[in-house]
Structure formats: structure tokens, C-alpha cells
């Protein structure tokens, strides 16, 4: 008779413990109910990127001195710099500059070490294409400034998201 009573008491304690765990989980769920959503509706809402965001690289052809520092500091030797030595003035003349963003890891070393600051990171991150060869940007494509999403009236911009506290 006593083993049956102790089993019944253990069953009751386990039931109370299970109900307490379910209640704790439900309280955590309810604490998240009044927070703002973390996800955004992407094509119609876009985040304003931070100041130090590393997006597409912008290139200013007139400032470049063809020193190839960007190629030397790149971990994958990505920028292609074609130049010609002008013998009469003994300086390099830049002919072509290109970066393949299909291979680029957006580390920012080329921007950081450029002595003339002809490279800069933009806030543009929408580089998707159907053909990977379209990601090879020459100096003309690199020279284009990105469109500002703040000026686009069809897109709702979101300035800050709720931070996740860990």
C-alpha cells in the first residue's frame, strides 16, 4: 500500500514541476510579445546601414596613381590594375581598374591602405545578378555613386532596430 502512495506523491510532484516549467516558458513568451518585430519586409522596407558599413567599393579614377597597394594588401589579390609607364614624365598612367565583386570578401583593406583615398566603401549592398560576369566592375561602374534609399519615396526606411540583449 505504501509504495502506491509514494508513487502517487511522486506523480503529483512531477505534475507540479511540469506545470511550473510550462508556466516559466509561457512567461518568457509573453515577455517577448510587446517587443518590436526584428524582421523587416525587405523590398518595401530597408534598413539605413551604419556609418562603418562595408558595401560596394567606390573608385575615383582621377585620384589613382597606380601604385598597386590595393592589390598587395588584398588577401585574394583581387583588384586588377592595368597601367602604362609614361617615359617622358616618368610616371605611371592608369589604363584600367576593375574589381570582381563575385570574389571580393569586402574586407576593406584596399580602402584602408590606399595612399590617395581613391577607394571608399559605399552603403550599397544589393549586388545580386543572374549572371556572375556582371559582378566584374570596371572603373566606370566603380565610379558610379549608389542611389540613396532615403530619397526613394516608395521605400520605407527603418533607422534603428530593437537591440537583442544577451
Curated annotation (Swiss-Prot):
It comes from the Eukaryota. The gene is ndhI. It catalyses: a plastoquinone + NADH + (n+1) H(+)(in) = a plastoquinol + NAD(+) + n H(+)(out); a plastoquinone + NADPH + (n+1) H(+)(in) = a plastoquinol + NADP(+) + n H(+)(out). It is found in: Plastid, Chloroplast thylakoid membrane. This is NAD(P)H-quinone oxidoreductase subunit I, chloroplastic. InterPro entries: 4Fe4S_Fe-S-bd, 4Fe4S_Fe_S_CS, NADH_quinone_OxRdtase_chainI, NDHI. NDH is composed of at least 16 different subunits, 5 of which are encoded in the nucleus. Keywords: 4Fe-4S, Chloroplast, Iron, Iron-sulfur, Membrane, Metal-binding, NAD, NADP, Plastid, Plastoquinone, Quinone, Repeat, Thylakoid, Translocase. It is a peripheral membrane protein. [4Fe-4S] cluster 2 binds at residues 74, 104, 107, 110.
Amino acid at each position: 500500500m505504501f509504495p502506491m502512495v509514494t508513487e502517487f506523491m511522486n506523480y503529483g510532484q512531477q505534475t507540479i514541476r511540469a506545470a511550473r516549467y510550462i508556466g516559466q516558458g509561457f512567461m518568457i513568451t509573453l515577455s517577448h510579445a510587446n517587443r518590436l518585430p526584428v524582421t523587416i519586409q525587405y523590398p518595401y522596407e530597408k534598413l539605413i546601414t551604419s556609418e562603418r558599413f562595408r558595401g560596394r567599393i567606390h573608385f575615383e579614377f582621377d585620384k589613382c596613381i597606380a601604385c598597386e597597394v590595393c592589390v598587395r594588401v588584398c588577401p585574394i589579390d583581387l583588384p586588377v590594375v592595368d597601367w602604362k609607364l609614361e617615359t617622358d614624365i616618368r610616371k605611371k598612367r592608369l589604363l584600367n581598374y576593375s574589381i570582381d565583386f563575385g570574389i571580393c570578401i569586402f574586407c576593406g583593406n584596399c580602402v584602408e591602405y590606399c595612399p590617395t583615398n581613391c577607394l571608399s566603401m559605399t552603403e550599397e549592398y544589393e549586388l545580386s545578378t543572374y549572371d556572375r560576369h556582371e559582378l566584374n566592375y570596371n572603373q566606370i561602374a566603380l565610379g558610379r555613386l549608389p542611389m540613396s534609399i532615403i530619397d526613394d519615396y516608395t521605400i520605407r526606411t527603418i533607422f534603428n532596430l530593437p537591440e537583442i540583449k544577451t
